[in-house]
Amino acid sequence: IVFRAAQKRSDIEIVAINDLLDAEYMAYMLKYDSTHGRFDGTVEVKDGHLVVNGKKIRVTAERDPANLKWDEVGVDVVAEATGIFLTDETARKHITAGAKKVVLTGPSKDNTPMFVRGANFDTYAGQDIVSNASCTTNCLAPLAKVINDNFGIVEGLMTTVHATTATQKTVDGPSHKDWRGGRGAAQNIIPSSTGAAKAVGKVLPELNGKLTGMAFRVPTPNVSVVDLTVRLEKAASYEEIKKAIKAASEGAMKGVLGYTEDDVVSTDFNGEVCTSVFDAKAGIALNDNFVKLV
């Protein structure tokens, strides 16, 4: 997914990929995607390299990032997407290998600084290893910031209705740490934990301790929903809330926070470039201080 997204940007050039898969299988997985469709471009393998749209990309299969010799191919930024090297100590092996920066594609397991577009991106001060948080935090944080900046959040609960992930089981199987998580993904709505709401407190310190949440894993292949229910400090009608979110989506958060009043469903957001899209028709208000936002 990172690779496909990068192909749509002129300011990103993929020069190397490290994976334990061989190049032929990488090419196959890039060409064909059950969720996002066929790759729009040419993909082939030559002399052990992946060649995409005529550009040669170095392929390696190193288990230890320290051996990757990123400097030999002029790597500026490594997208650390294995889910294994999630601490400063382990991710720093990429720096040792010659990379200048490392972005963890999920939450870190230590105090590695976390940055989210639409939340605290402007506080980035050049750190060489950062986390981009989780997909749920990226969806929640921009919306929470707009609401808190305009109306103040006293407290809130978040529920994410989350598409299935690769760690789930196609049929019931062993899952010793999470018994429910071992049940068949295609057959069940599975309650699960998530640290996404609490993580918002790391990127928006003013909300630290004010939000928590949970997840339901559901049998859909892609696109998840965040349901944010909050109590407001400043009373506001639902129309006023919509107006504030729409203004943000057209202003400072354009390209990060989207806004729609269409009668949309989840598949309409397959391939969406915004990290969060507010569904104006889906939310409801109990009164001017208690509201559910989707």
Curated annotation (Swiss-Prot):
Active-site residue list: 135 (nucleophile)
Catalytic activity: D-glyceraldehyde 3-phosphate + phosphate + NAD(+) = (2R)-3-phospho-glyceroyl phosphate + NADH + H(+)
Sections of the chain in a coiled coil: none
GO molecular function: glyceraldehyde-3-phosphate dehydrogenase (NAD+) (phosphorylating) activity; NAD binding; NADP binding
Entry's localization field: Cytoplasm
Keywords on record: Acetylation, Cytoplasm, Glycolysis, NAD, Nucleotide-binding, Oxidoreductase
UniProt-annotated binding residues for NAD(+): 19, 63, 105
Main location: cytoplasm
Keyword Calcium: no
A single GO BP: glucose metabolic process
One annotated Gene Ontology cellular component of this protein: cytoplasm
Binding site for D-glyceraldehyde 3-phosphate: 134-136, 165, 194-195, 217
Enzyme's top EC category: oxidoreductase
Pathway where it operates: Carbohydrate degradation; glycolysis; pyruvate from D-glyceraldehyde 3-phosphate: step 1/5
Classification via InterPro entries: GlycerAld/Erythrose_P_DH, GlycerAld_3-P_DH_AS, GlycerAld_3-P_DH_cat, GlycerAld_3-P_DH_NAD(P)-bd, Glyceraldehyde-3-P_DH_1, NAD(P)-bd_dom_sf
Modified residues (N6-acetyllysine): 177, 234
Enzyme Commission (EC) number: 1.2.1.12
Site (Activates thiol group during catalysis): residue numbering on this chain: 162
Record's function text: Catalyzes the oxidative phosphorylation of glyceraldehyde 3-phosphate (G3P) to 1,3-bisphosphoglycerate (BPG) using the cofactor NAD. The first reaction step involves the formation of a hemiacetal intermediate between G3P and a cysteine residue, and this hemiacetal intermediate is then oxidized to a thioester, with concomitant reduction of NAD to NADH. The reduced NADH is then exchanged with the second NAD, and the thioester is attacked by a nucleophilic inorganic phosphate to produce BPG.
Recorded family membership: Belongs to the glyceraldehyde-3-phosphate dehydrogenase family.
NCBIfam families per record: GAPDH-I, PRK15425.1
Subunit structure: Homotetramer.
The protein, known as: Glyceraldehyde-3-phosphate dehydrogenase
Biological classification of the source: Bacteria, Pseudomonadati, Pseudomonadota, Gammaproteobacteria, Enterobacterales
Gene: gap
